[in-house]
């Protein structure tokens, strides 16, 4: 399933769609959050 993005409420299948995916698999709006990285591609589809 898709994961809702806290930044704007849109949903993303890949982190690049609208947010960054953390190692936990939860989407966060900024890489400044602990554990977040734009280089971490976690598929949520």
Curated annotation (Swiss-Prot):
<keyword id="KW-0964">Secreted</keyword>
<dbReference type="InterPro" id="IPR012624">
    <property type="entry name" value="Toxin_19"/>
</dbReference>
<feature type="disulfide bond">
    <location>
        <begin position="5"/>
        <end position="19"/>
    </location>
</feature>
<feature type="disulfide bond">
    <location>
        <begin position="21"/>
        <end position="36"/>
    </location>
</feature>
<keyword id="KW-0738">Voltage-gated sodium channel impairing toxin</keyword>
<dbReference type="InterPro" id="IPR013141">
    <property type="entry name" value="Conotoxin-I_CS"/>
</dbReference>
<comment type="similarity">
    <text>Belongs to the conotoxin I1 superfamily.</text>
</comment>
<dbReference type="GO" id="GO:0017080">
    <property type="term" value="F:sodium channel regulator activity"/>
</dbReference>
<keyword id="KW-0208">D-amino acid</keyword>
<feature type="disulfide bond">
    <location>
        <begin position="12"/>
        <end position="22"/>
    </location>
</feature>
<feature type="propeptide" description="Removed by a carboxypeptidase">
    <location>
        <position position="45"/>
    </location>
</feature>
<keyword id="KW-0800">Toxin</keyword>
<keyword id="KW-0872">Ion channel impairing toxin</keyword>
<dbReference type="GO" id="GO:0005576">
    <property type="term" value="C:extracellular region"/>
</dbReference>
<dbReference type="GO" id="GO:0090729">
    <property type="term" value="F:toxin activity"/>
</dbReference>
<feature type="disulfide bond">
    <location>
        <begin position="18"/>
        <end position="27"/>
    </location>
</feature>
<protein>
    <recommendedName>
        <fullName>Iota-conotoxin-like R11.13</fullName>
    </recommendedName>
</protein>
<feature type="modified residue" description="D-leucine">
    <location>
        <position position="43"/>
    </location>
</feature>
<comment type="function">
    <text>Iota-conotoxins bind to voltage-gated sodium channels (Nav) and act as agonists by shifting the voltage-dependence of activation to more hyperpolarized levels. Produces general excitatory symptoms.</text>
</comment>
<keyword id="KW-0528">Neurotoxin</keyword>
<dbReference type="Pfam" id="PF08088">
    <property type="entry name" value="Toxin_19"/>
</dbReference>
<keyword id="KW-1015">Disulfide bond</keyword>
């Amino acid at each position: 399933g898709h994961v809702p993005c806290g930044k704007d409420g849109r949903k993303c299948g890949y982190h690049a769609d609208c947010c960054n995916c953390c190692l936990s698999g939860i989407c966060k709006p900024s890489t400044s959050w602990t554990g977040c990285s734009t280089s971490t591609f976690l598929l949520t589809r």
